[in-house]
Amino acid sequence: MVSQRVQALLNQLRTQGIADERVLEAIAQVPREKFVDEAFEHKAWENVALPIGQGQTISQPYMVARMTELLELTPESRVLEIGTGSGYQTAILAHLVHHVCSVERIKGLQWHARRRLKQLDLHNVSTRHGDGWLGWQARAPFDAIIVTAAPLEIPAALLSQLDNGGILVLPVGDEHQLLKRVRRRDGEFIIDTVEAVRFVPLVKGELA
């Protein structure tokens, strides 16, 4: 039995076009209040992005659901997330697939995200402190790659780590960003534009 706040959010997401019941169920199961600062807990189930420190944000639930839905995940999908952030998107993915790999360039965020995921008994996640532009070559190829910050162009390393038939979902651009879905098919990349979005930039390198 979900609370009224959770049900209200799920109804709003359905109205906004989210149709994948597995994604909606994951949204309902992951306690978003555990991934935000105490000062913002009262806003945790609102359909808004919230600050998490270090100039980063936790994406609004609609965008989390939309990007996750676009990945067309199955339980067997090998998933790479670029930008662990608070760990909220990671937790949603962990409810949908057997294992998630996630890269975060800011060490402090990675540490806190890993702690939160363990507290929620989500042990099917591997996190790594590193440069998201480079992906995670040692774990490639991936069936699905999701990027939660916006590069100016699609990183070549991520394209190379996408398996045949795989899907990459990411925002691209500077001031005017567009959400893109890239599907790899027989060595070619088919790119679709989904909608206008606003994300923090995907910065190269890693921070201690």
UniProtKB/Swiss-Prot annotation:
PROSITE patterns: PCMT. Catalyzes the methyl esterification of L-isoaspartyl residues in peptides and proteins that result from spontaneous decomposition of normal L-aspartyl and L-asparaginyl residues. It plays a role in the repair and/or degradation of damaged proteins. It catalyses: [protein]-L-isoaspartate + S-adenosyl-L-methionine = [protein]-L-isoaspartate alpha-methyl ester + S-adenosyl-L-homocysteine. The gene is pcm. One of its GO terms (cellular component) is cytoplasm. One of its GO terms (molecular function) is protein-L-isoaspartate (D-aspartate) O-methyltransferase activity. InterPro entries: PCMT (IPR000682), SAM-dependent_MTases_sf (IPR029063). Coiled coil: none annotated. It comes from the Bacteria. It is found in: Cytoplasm. Pfam families: PCMT. Its main location: cytoplasm. NCBIfam families: pimt, PRK00312.1. This is Protein-L-isoaspartate O-methyltransferase. Its EC number is 2.1.1.77. Keywords: Cytoplasm, Methyltransferase, S-adenosyl-L-methionine, Transferase. The active site is at S59. One of its GO terms (biological process) is methylation.
